[in-house]
């Protein structure tokens, strides 16, 4: 059996890192190929030859004859599109929300890999997930939330998030400033505004303290971080903005800060917090949701005051259920404690970081993922043979289209002539109605089986 992985492989968000980490790791244990749904103009900076071996296709929204349609394209480095017989593959779909990939009609075994930040899945999406053979989640908390909503416990597996190998402690650069570091997309869930307000109030009369932030948010509309701070009267010489830093810059800031700061209302995992712990950085966190899977044994936790609705109209955060409201008065106390007793907390975190790293390496968690899949389906290995290669007949990518079905699928043999008169051939599970809608009389298809 092969594993066809569907997810957001390209990009710089936490979930892009999550997807790449798992798919890269899984490829060491099983034959996989990947369908990606994100775009990143800077992907050449991190996509390597191993990635190119497993990245098979990408789903993009295209405008064809004034109609917005979802199209699948081969990647530019592929001379052939790779697939396997539909009876020999398992589908693994991972996305950070109720993404359209979850609604596709997959032939054969299918596994959902979901990460949720509130305590309640969207009911319609949950009904879709119930049709999957199993659902992999990151934490016990997420599993408990699913069970409370009536999800079959026997269909839930837990696989933890991984840590990038570039996360480890260093000898820090000397500085005359005590540096806090706050990371996360500005918004309601991450409680960025409230956290900055608390910091400024706490250290109003202490001069040797800085708060470094990387909190840019391009949605729903782009507002520069400096402008957001001005809107809420939070501009201060104590705040140092780092806008969309490259990975090496981000790590240099993280590894040289004194205390990492996070006080969010809901986390599926909290990758920045995990990376800070791996680097031996004393870390402040809110004591709720998914991050407790790995952070609860650390001392700088902030209590939860109450549950509040997750839905937040102003911030366009449309989650169901509830999230945790941190006690921001207690956050002020923890901030001061971490500042005054820094050497004690630094020693504790340095003592713990090597064990933490070994527990969450990508190699380990990817092996856990493989074991979970193999236990349910078996017959998965690196030695599987049988890739079917669908050759392209032109180097020009324009005009090569295929699409997967939301509804009734069939195996087809398709010939497509584009506007230049070029003829293309390909095979895949596609929805004939969608293809005919996109290409009209240009399409000739023969159904092989349903």
Summary of predicted features, one role per range:
Residues 323-331, 340-371:
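A charged, aromatic-enriched C-terminal amphipathic alpha-helix characteristic of glycosyltransferases
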Residues 1-86, 399, 404:
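N-terminal pre-catalytic "stem/leader" segment of glycosyltransferase-like enzymes
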Residues 123-124, 162-178:
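Acidic anion/phosphate-binding donor-loop and adjacent secondary structure
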Residues 223-248:
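Nucleotide-activated donor-binding/catalytic signature segment of Leloir-type glycosyltransferases, i.e.
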Residues 282-285, 300-303:
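Short hydrophobic beta-strand element within catalytic cores of glycosyltransferases
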Residues 265:
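Aromatic "clamp/platform" in nucleotide-sugar-dependent glycosyltransferases that forms part
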Residues 4, 173-190, 196-199, 211-213:
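Conserved donor-binding/catalytic core segment of Leloir-type glycosyltransferases
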Residues 4, 48-147, 249, 432-436, ...:
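Extended catalytic core of nucleotide-activated donor transferases of GT-like folds
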């Amino acid at each position: 059996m092969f594993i066809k992985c569907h997810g957001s492989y390209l990009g710089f968000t936490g979930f892009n890192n999550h997807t790449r980490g798992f798919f890269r790791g899984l490829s060491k244990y099983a034959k996989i190929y990947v369908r990606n749904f994100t775009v990143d103009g800077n992907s050449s900076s991190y996509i390597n030859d191993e990635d190119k071996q497993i990245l098979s296709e990408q789903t993009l929204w295209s405008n064809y004859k004034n109609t917005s349609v979802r199209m699948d394209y081969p990647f530019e480095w592929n001379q052939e599109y790779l697939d396997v017989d539909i009876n020999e593959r398992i589908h693994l779909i991972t996305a950070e929300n109720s993404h359209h990939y979850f609604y596709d009609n997959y032939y054969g075994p299918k596994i959902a890999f979901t990460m949720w930040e509130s305590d309640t899945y969207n009911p319609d999406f949950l009904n879709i997930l119930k049709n999957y053979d199993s659902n992999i989640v990151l934490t016990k908390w997420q599993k408990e939330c699913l069970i409370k909503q009536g999800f079959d416990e026997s269909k839930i597996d837990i696989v933890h998030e991984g840590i990038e190998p570039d996360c480890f402690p260093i000898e820090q650069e000397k500085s005359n400033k005590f540096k806090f570091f706050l990371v996360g997309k500005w918004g309601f869930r991450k409680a960025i505004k409230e956290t900055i307000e608390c910091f400024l109030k706490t250290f109003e009369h202490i001069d040797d303290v800085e708060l470094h932030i990387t909190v840019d948010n391009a949605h729903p509309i782009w507002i520069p971080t400096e402008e957001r701070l001005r809107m809420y009267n939070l501009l201060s010489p104590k705040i140092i903005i780092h806008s969309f830093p490259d990975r090496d810059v981000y790590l240099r800031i993280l590894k040289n800060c004194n205390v990492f700061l996070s006080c969010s209302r809901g986390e599926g995992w909290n990758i920045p917090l995990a990376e800070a712990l791996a680097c031996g950085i004393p870390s402040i966190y809110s004591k709720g949701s998914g991050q407790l899977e790995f952070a609860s044994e650390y001392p700088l936790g902030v209590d939860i005051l109450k549950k509040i609705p997750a839905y937040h109209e102003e911030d366009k955060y449309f989650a169901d259920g509830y999230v945790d409201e941190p006690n921001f008065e207690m956050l002020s106390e923890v901030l001061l404690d971490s500042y005054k007793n820094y050497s004690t907390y630094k020693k504790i975190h340095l003592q713990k970081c090597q064990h933490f790293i070994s527990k969450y390496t990508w190699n380990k968690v990817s092996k856990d993922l493989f074991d979970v899949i193999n236990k349910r389906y078996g017959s998965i290995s690196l030695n599987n043979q049988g890739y079917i290669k669908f050759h392209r007949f032109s180097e020009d990518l324009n005009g090569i289209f295929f699409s997967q079905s939301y509804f009734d699928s069939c195996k087809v043999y398709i010939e497509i002539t584009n506007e230049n008169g070029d003829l293309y051939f390909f095979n895949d599970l596609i929805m004939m109605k969608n293809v005919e809608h996109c290409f009209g009389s240009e399409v000739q298809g023969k159904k092989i089986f349903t």
